[in-house]
Amino acid sequence: MGKIRKLDDQLSNLIAAGEVVERPASVVKELVENSIDANSTSIEIHLEEAGLSKIRIIDNGDGIAEEDCIVAFERHATSKIKDENDLFRIRTLGFRGEALPSIASVSELELITSTGDAPGTHLIIKGGDIIKQEKTASRKGTDITVQNLFFNTPARLKYMKTIHTELGNITDIVYRIAMSHPEVSLKLFHNEKKLLHTSGNGDVRQVLASIYSIQVAKKLVPIEAESLDFTIKGYVTLPEVTRASRNYMSTIVNGRYVRNFVLMKAIQQGYHTLLPVGRYPIGFLSIEMDPMLVDVNVHPAKLEVRFSKEQELLKLIEETLQAAFKKIQLIPDAGVTTKKKEKDESVQEQFQFEHAKPKEPSMPEIVLPTGMDEKQEEPQAVKQSAQLWQPPKQEWQPPQSLVREEQSWQPSTKSIIEEPIREEKSWNSNDEDFELEELEEEVQEIEEIEMNGNDLPPLYPIGQMHGTYIFAQNDKGLYMIDQHAAQERINYEYFRDKVGRVAQEVQELLVPYRIDLSLTEFLRVEEQLEELKKVGLFLEQFGHQSFIVRSHPTWFPKGQETEIIDEMMEQVVKLKKVDIKKLREEAAIMMSCKASIKANQYLTNDQIFALLEELRTTTNPYTCPHGRPILVHHSTYELEKMFKRVM
């Protein structure tokens, strides 16, 4: 008898579940996407113990016909594609036919569904085996409950994280879906506590306000562009609103949230020199294109895609963002205190894929274990020792409450997140309607950011503080200017132009400068000698592992020539292959910093006036090349309020 055998369907589904159903968040993602594909306009998501105990999804979509219910749980059974041509024209979120059988194979699942023109179907499946199938009275749509996830795969269950982490993963997914489909009303509950409610009115800015806060929504810049192949719409924050992680950038392709590093990189490039190192914007970009231009069949989770015209898309994103910022005066308002900004950022840190932290008023709420101060960050020791969820030991019983629509489900009393049990609010709750109406009004009242050019307004100097900061004024109020950052921007644009020129005016060194390298570094540099001449490095071989420099461009900062050569060489030997564009950029930034006024350097009034006038001639007078702000603004109103002239 041969050793190779065909696996049965149940074992195949268990193997597939290892890729498709990684954690509770995977289940939520797949089921909610199915609801959206079924033309749902409202979706409820109910969780217990971060989905490890129970996940319930209720929608008002098309429902599943009785004859399709069993087939839907067979592997590679789908209504979304018919032949290989459909695979290259996919508009739906799902298409592989793997999610439902994979989820059913590692859980205890109950399905109640109806198409609205016939009796509904009630189906119970445990570990991939059908336990019960019957007709039932049901409204149009689908109500699916997944309980005791991974009950038959203890190895997978063992590696589930804490309640907070798993809940954070789920909220991350739901937030992205809410942004992708603002036309769908989404409601997320955890142990009967509401975490998110979107109106479904199609206004993505309102969804962003629900997730990030109304304060962030006020700092959003609308982005819109179109080419022959792509249409881009979305919002990105002003450079003054940043976070320490890329997790706040969301990219949507044909209605599907995707994780694509090059798209995020393109967004960052659109902010070129506007962001400090290690800081990232909050952004949402929705990209529409012909399905033939994108391959979504890359990974079972469908989070990764490949583009056939990637470079054209990246260029369009970069140019669109850069064009938008050129229309705006990017002067940060000093009216928001540091404490307020720190608080707001601590709120936004909840939106990280691996962490879920306590709630601030503007964010969906996640309740801490009893006894923990809500205003304190969860200590690392607490995170590491947090109790892991344990599956219930009693025999599973299908909840009868799911059979009849009018009966409400009861939350588990064994949650490690202790909270009082409260009655679940109905969809027509007056309180919820009021909250959404209030948010809608706030979003509508947001003043659009003025796009009347980014020219720096005339500034009239009135003094200098500590030899570092310049004070100036105009009819808009008071401005504080960092003199080093201001001249750094001026010098950067000068050196950027010089480094980019092919023909270099050179000056001989009195004494040739010798550079000693290791053999590996020497060989790496030797390959790039012609390229390095383009950035002003004129190297001649001197011995087996050395180079000498006899001349340098005339525009090198005086007295710092050898130091600049050393730093440029350091950049070169770090790289396996020299990126001339990047090296030019780094060289211009480095030289602009070294050639600029330093702190504690006092200037005359004429020097200050000349500096401000020269700053106005730059293409971006608002940030230094490292992304730090050059000036901040105190409006006259803020000053009057500070001195209690207005209340």
Swiss-Prot record:
Residues 377-396 are annotated as: Disordered. It comes from the Bacteria. Keywords: DNA damage, DNA repair. Gene3D superfamilies: 3.30.230.10, Histidine kinase-like ATPase, C-terminal domain, MutL, C-terminal domain, dimerisation subdomain, MutL, C-terminal domain, regulatory subdomain. Belongs to the DNA mismatch repair MutL/HexB family. One of its GO terms (molecular function) is ATP-dependent DNA damage sensor activity. InterPro entries: DNA_mismatch_repair_CS, DNA_mismatch_repair_MutL, DNA_mismatch_S5_2-like, HATPase_C_sf, MutL/Mlh/PMS, MutL/Mlh/Pms-like, MutL_C, MutL_C_dimsub. NCBIfam families: mutl, PRK00095.1-3. Residues 387-396 have a biased composition (Low complexity). This protein is involved in the repair of mismatches in DNA. It is required for dam-dependent methyl-directed DNA mismatch repair. May act as a 'molecular matchmaker', a protein that promotes the formation of a stable complex between two or more DNA-binding proteins in an ATP-dependent manner without itself being part of a final effector complex. This is DNA mismatch repair protein MutL. GO terms for cellular component: mismatch repair complex. One of its GO terms (biological process) is mismatch repair.
